[in-house]
Amino acid sequence: MSRKPCCVGEGLKKGAWTTEEDKKLISYIHDHGEGGWRDIPQKAGLKRCGKSCRLRWTNYLKPEIKRGEFSSEEEQIIIMLHASRGNKWSVIARHLPRRTDNEIKNYWNTHLKKRLMEQGIDPVTHKPLASSSNPTVDENLNSPNASSSDKQYSRSSSMPFLSRPPPSSCNMVSKVSELSSNDGTPIQGSSLSCKKRFKKSSSTSRLLNKVAAKATSIKDILSASMEGSLSATTISHASFFNGFTEQIRNEEDSSNTSLTNTLAEFDPFSPSSLYPEHEINATSDLNMDQDYDFSQFFEKFGGDNHNEENSMNDLLMSDVSQEVSSTSVDDQDNMVGNFEGWSNYLLDHTNFMYDTDSDSLEKHFI
C-alpha cells in the first residue's frame, strides 16, 4: 500500500513564504500547538503543502531557533562530526542546541567546505589532497580501458615497503657463484681453515719424525758399540722400523686421525729422509782410532764415580731438541768414530753403570 499524499497538488503555492503566510502559521500553531501538519494548511487558510508548513516552522519560525553567525567552537564541532558521520545533518544538529539541521547544512556548503579546500584538505575524506588522489587513480585503473602495465605500476607503488621482495637475493647468489672454484664446487671458509691447520700439523709431525728417528738410531748405535757387536755393514732399515713403529703405537691413542694420515703419507724409512748419504757412510766406517785415550775425557768431569755416571747419562740420554740444535754433522761423525773406544773404556772400568731404554740389552755392565 502506498502512502497517501498529504495534499493535492492542484492550486498549491510554491516558492518563498511571504510575511502574511508566516503570521498565519505562527498564530495557528500558537493557538493549537504543533502536530497535524496535513490539516494545518486548510485550518490556517494557507495554500501550502503540509510538509512545507512543517519545514517553515521548524527551520525558521520556531522561537527557540538560534540566529546569527556560528562560533569557532561550533565550527570545530561540525567539522569533527562531519569527518566521522558524514552528511547526516540531523545527527550533527543534536550536538548543537538551538541549531537546525538545515542551517548546519547550509553553513557547511557555503563556508566550511570552501575553507577546508583552501587549506589543502579534502572535505569528503578530511585528508590532504595529495594522498586523496590515489582513489581517482584506482578508479581509472579499474576501468576496462586500463592497460596491464598501469595496473602493475599501481600495485608496486601501493605495496608496502616491508612486503616487497628484497633485491639483495640476486646479489647473494652472485656472491656464492664468485666463491665457487673452477670445477664448479663451492669453496667453504671452514674447509680452508682446516686445510691450513692440517698443513701446519703435517709439517710439525714430519719434523718430529725425523728427530725421533735420529734419536733412536743414535741410541741403537751406542748400545751396540758398548756390547762390541756393531757390524761393519750399513744399519738396516728393519732396526729403524722396529723403533719407529713402537713410538707410533704409543702415540696413536692421543693423536687424531689427521696426524695418522700425515704419518702414513711420509716415509720415514727412506735413506734420503732420515740420513744423508755421507752420514750413513760415516756410521759404517768402523776403522776408528784405537789409541784414543778416553780416560782424559772423563777426568774433566771430576774424580769421583758419581760424576762420571751422571755425565755419561747426560751424553747418552740427552733431549732430542738439544741434539738437533747443538750437534752438527761433523760433531756426530766424531762421536760415532769414537764408539769403539768408549766400549773399551767401559770394559776396563767395572764401576761404571749404564741404563738403556731398549728391552733387548742388559741393564748393567760390570
Curated annotation (Swiss-Prot):
Recorded GO CC terms: nucleus
Entry keyword set: DNA-binding, Nucleus, Repeat, Transcription, Transcription regulation
Ranges annotated as biased composition (Low complexity): 147-158
Domain HTH myb-type: 9-61, 62-116
GO molecular function: DNA-binding transcription factor activity; transcription cis-regulatory region binding
Ranges for region Disordered: 124-170
Residues annotated to bind DNA: 37-61, 89-112
GO terms under biological process: cellular response to sulfur starvation; defense response to fungus; induced systemic resistance; regulation of DNA-templated transcription; regulation of glucosinolate biosynthetic process; response to bacterium; response to insect
Localisation per UniProt entry: Nucleus
Subunit annotation: Can form complexes with MYC2, MYC3 or MYC4.
Entry protein name: Transcription factor MYB28
Designated gene of the protein: MYB28
